[in-house]
């Protein structure tokens, strides 16, 4: 992905795993387990990301330049080389996240205009 990002739209749609990881990192850096917890919270438990999916996706996202490993330690006292790796969005990752969120919002708007989505969920409409 990193070689030819002259036209990032070519890489949309993002996979659900990549989208959820980018979304989890949107408000700051996190370690892998923190990302898994954030994805679970953001999706109200509907998406449970296991370590294989998470770290496979992280590896590809690092190579693509969507995220980077943080050089900073969350706790300066942690000088143990076995410390957890922390990840953060790059400018490209934030741009791709925004583009995908806009694409998804457009799809939701279409569903609304076709009366697929209930406008008042408190009434239990379907």
Name these PLM-found stretches.
Residues 64-80, 88:
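Beta-hairpin "wing" of winged helix-turn-helix
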Residues 54-61:
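Basic amphipathic alpha-helical segments that dock to polyanions
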Residues 9-53:
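N-terminal helix-turn-helix DNA-binding core of bacterial DNA-binding proteins
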Residues 13, 79-83:
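A generic structural micro-feature
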Residues 2, 92-126:
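Amphipathic alpha-helical dimerization/coiled-coil segments
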Residues 1-10:
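Short, Lys/Arg-enriched N-terminal segment that forms or immediately precedes the first helix
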